[in-house]
Amino acid sequence: DVLMFRDPVCSTYNFPRERVMFLPERNCNPFFHFIEGLWMLAGRRDVEPLARFVKRMKEFSDDGNFLYGSYGYRWRNQFGYDQLHDVVQKLKDNKWDRRIVLSMWDPVHDLHYKGKDVPCNTQIYFKAYPTKELGEENNQIKLDMTVCCRSNDLIWGAYGANAVHFSMLHEYI
């Protein structure tokens, strides 16, 4: 059964470095998600390194070799350039820039793709803000990261694997 929500669902991670959520319903290997996060940051899409840890990973590949919707590959290669490099550079150039968007959805290919692995998460927005303006006593600059999702499994995807992956991306940026 799929639980459907009429309105958008929003989750806030106040402690993103606490990457792993341990839920009795979800028996997972937290080290695998860490390895997968590094694999993403490297811009890979080959399934073999992940299949060494979780054999079922090949079931999500159309050809047994590559994951079509690999976020890391899309961050680093999909659109002909390294988006992560540009995100970091834009923040260095102007930390208050509100146009920093990391795309994972490729409308030219994904909208009509019939395969197994279409990205659930579509975009990520980055926004820096001064904490003093939010009532905090110290005046630090924090980086907010908002992940937009078209569809996701809350326990297995969002609160499981994606919490680890995106917290690593947040720290990398």
Question: What are these language model-derived features?
Answer:
Residues 1-173:
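Terminal, non-catalytic protein-protein interaction segments that mediate quaternary/complex assembly
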